[in-house]
């Protein structure tokens, strides 16, 4: 560790992680992906699943924005979101979409099911989480908003949700 009590990459890899997987589905911006990697590093997130046309950590802009978090946070790439969700289900993860929807649960009210591993799906910056993902998910979580836009940057939304999940 250095003077700021930061773990080395190896210490981070060995550290116990929060049983949360972040699934990024068709995120356009490499900068948003890099930001989410940094957030995942900050909160000891288990893994990030990259789906669809989401830029992978090997993309120059993701790597630059992530400030090294692509080396500490595990990640996997999937051609389709369905493939990713199938793998999550096979490994006993509950899948929750982050989206504004009729039957969504407020993030303030959401409680992680006891002894359950969870995956959180963040969708495209313009169209959000796909309908097919909403149908496959165990539920939908919504970030309460009080302004006029009811729209958050996906990187900001990831930070809010992940902070809440690791600080119930």
Q: For each of these PLM feature ranges, what is it?
A:
Residues 1-168:
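Post-transcriptional modification and biogenesis factors for structured RNAs
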């Amino acid at each position: 560790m250095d003077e700021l009590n930061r773990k080395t990459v190896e210490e981070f890899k060995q550290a116990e992680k929060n049983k949360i997987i972040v699934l990024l589905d068709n995120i356009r911006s490499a900068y948003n992906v890099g930001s989410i990697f940094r957030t995942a590093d900050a909160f000891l997130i288990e893994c990030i699943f990259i789906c669809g046309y989401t830029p992978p950590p090997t993309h120059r802009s993701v790597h630059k924005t992530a400030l090294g978090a692509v080396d500490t946070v595990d990640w996997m790439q999937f051609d389709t979101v369905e493939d990713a969700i199938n793998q999550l289900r096979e490994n006993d993860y509950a899948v929750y979409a982050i989206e504004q929807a009729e039957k969504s649960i407020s993030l303030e009210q959401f409680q992680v099911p006891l002894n359950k591993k969870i995956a959180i799906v963040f969708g495209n910056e313009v169209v959000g989480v796909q309908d097919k993902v909403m149908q496959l998910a165990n539920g939908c979580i919504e970030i309460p908003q009080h302004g006029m836009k009811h729209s958050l940057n996906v990187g900001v939304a990831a930070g809010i949700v992940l902070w809440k999940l690791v600080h119930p």
